[in-house]
Amino acid sequence: MFDMGFLELMLIGVVALLVLGPERLPTAARTVGLWVGKIKRTVSGMQREISAQLEAEELRQKLNEQQRKLDAGLGKVRDEVERHGDAPSSRGGQPPPSRTTPTAARSADDTDETPPSTAASRETPEPPAAPSAKDSNAP
């Protein structure tokens, strides 16, 4: 960080011992260590924020570039459509014929959305009830 060697650190330690004395030197060293840690955390936080902002700016630039390409392609398509004119108006104002797919042309009777009670009655007809002994007027 400060590019200091061992001799510079030793000189700072000796000066601090002479100025502060042996009783206050450990407390001062602890305080200096805490401040250095806070400064390092602050600097690393700033570096992370700056790199995140740079990445976001790069993404914005890429997004703008892609948007310009899309706009250019859309402009070409619009020019082609305008150059060929209105196709439906040249046919007498009638809309183009619609095409139906086999799944879209299925009738309502063929769908699976029929209630179960009606679907069951449609699939298997019930046989007529056999006459019982109570219903018959036999002598």
UniProtKB/Swiss-Prot annotation:
Q: How does it sit in the membrane?
A: Single-pass membrane protein
Which superkingdom, per the lineage?
Bacteria
GO function term, MF aspect, one: protein transmembrane transporter activity
Start-end of Basic and acidic residues biased regions: 66-86
Pfam families, per the entry: TatA_B_E
Keyword Cell inner membrane applies: yes
Q: Name one GO cellular component term.
A: TAT protein transport complex
According to its UniProt record, where is this protein located? Cell inner membrane
Q: Matching Gene3D superfamilies, A to Z?
A: 1.20.5.3310
Spell out where the chain crosses the membrane: 1-21
Hydrolase among the record's keywords?
A: no
Q: Which UniProt keywords apply?
A: Cell inner membrane, Cell membrane, Membrane, Protein transport, Translocation, Transmembrane, Transmembrane helix, Transport
Using the UniProt annotation, give all residue ranges assigned to the region (Disordered).
66-139
One GO BP annotation is: protein transport by the Tat complex
* Matches recorded under InterPro entries: TatA/B/E, TatB
Q: Please report which protein family the annotation says this sequence is part of.
A: Belongs to the TatB family.
* Database matches in NCBIfam families: tatB
Q: How does it assemble?
A: The Tat system comprises two distinct complexes: a TatABC complex, containing multiple copies of TatA, TatB and TatC subunits, and a separate TatA complex, containing only TatA subunits. Substrates initially bind to the TatABC complex, which probably triggers association of the separate TatA complex to form the active translocon.
What does this protein do, in the record's words? Part of the twin-arginine translocation (Tat) system that transports large folded proteins containing a characteristic twin-arginine motif in their signal peptide across membranes. Together with TatC, TatB is part of a receptor directly interacting with Tat signal peptides. TatB may form an oligomeric binding site that transiently accommodates folded Tat precursor proteins before their translocation.
Indicate what this protein is called per its UniProt record.
Sec-independent protein translocase protein TatB
Q: Which organism is it from?
A: Chromohalobacter salexigens (strain ATCC BAA-138 / DSM 3043 / CIP 106854 / NCIMB 13768 / 1H11)
